[in-house]
């Protein structure tokens, strides 16, 4: 088949025009798609509420929770546990000391009762002798003996009260320090000593 020169030239000239038309149509389609795509983005939902992002949000939530849990278990909780354990040991030691002081007080009471019994026995013997020496002299000796007994009784009571007060004061101070430390470790706040003291006193009064 023979192709004339004029036909070949016409075909060559028409090919670029056809190509240009195809490119123009493609650009038009791309432009329309881009407009539609932008319109779709403009009317989209808020990203945190977009269901396509749920997986990544759950993943980051799990990672954040895991890091927070590690921080609590490795840093915060061991420190709080150490403080509580130290305070617990100190309270146990102070309670043991308070028990010893109470034992000393009981021993002092027993000694006082023994001395009182001896004094009463002596007073009885003095009274018996007074019947022979005279009523006046017996009354004087009895008054002297009773004064000595009263003095010893008062001294013993003051000693017992001081021992008990010291023991309760030590326990109260330890409770206040422990409460203030726990508040500082858990809440990161500096506890008011007056408020802590009032709270501890209120608890002790309710348990009394």
Curated annotation (Swiss-Prot):
The Gene Ontology terms for molecular function here are: proton-transporting ATP synthase activity, rotational mechanism; proton-transporting ATPase activity, rotational mechanism
Q: Which family does it belong to?
A: Belongs to the ATPase B chain family.
Question: What does the record note on quaternary structure?
Answer: F-type ATPases have 2 components, F(1) - the catalytic core - and F(0) - the membrane proton channel. F(1) has five subunits: alpha(3), beta(3), gamma(1), delta(1), epsilon(1). F(0) has three main subunits: a(1), b(2) and c(10-14). The alpha and beta chains form an alternating ring which encloses part of the gamma chain. F(1) is attached to F(0) by a central stalk formed by the gamma and epsilon chains, while a peripheral stalk is formed by the delta and b chains.
User: What keywords appear on the UniProt entry?
Assistant: ATP synthesis, Cell inner membrane, Cell membrane, CF(0), Hydrogen ion transport, Ion transport, Membrane, Transmembrane, Transmembrane helix, Transport
| GO cellular component labels | plasma membrane; proton-transporting ATP synthase complex
Sum up the protein's function in the record's words: F(1)F(0) ATP synthase produces ATP from ADP in the presence of a proton or sodium gradient. F-type ATPases consist of two structural domains, F(1) containing the extramembraneous catalytic core and F(0) containing the membrane proton channel, linked together by a central stalk and a peripheral stalk. During catalysis, ATP synthesis in the catalytic domain of F(1) is coupled via a rotary mechanism of the central stalk subunits to proton translocation. Component of the F(0) channel, it forms part of the peripheral stalk, linking F(1) to F(0).
Q: Where is this region: Disordered?
A: 1-26
Point to the regions of Polar residues compositional bias. Answer: 1-18
**Residue ranges crossing the lipid bilayer per the database entry:** 56-78
Q: Is Cell membrane given among the entry's keywords?
A: yes
Originating species = Brucella canis (strain ATCC 23365 / NCTC 10854 / RM-666)
> Where found, per UniProt?
Cell inner membrane
In the bilayer, the protein is annotated as: Single-pass membrane protein
Quote the protein name from its UniProt record. ATP synthase subunit b 1
Its main subcellular localisation, reduced to a broad class, is: membrane
One family name in Pfam for this protein: ATP-synt_B
PANTHER family referenced in this protein's UniProt entry, alphabetically: ATP SYNTHASE SUBUNIT B, ATP SYNTHASE SUBUNIT B', CHLOROPLASTIC
Q: What does the record give as the organism's lineage?
A: Bacteria, Pseudomonadati, Pseudomonadota, Alphaproteobacteria, Hyphomicrobiales
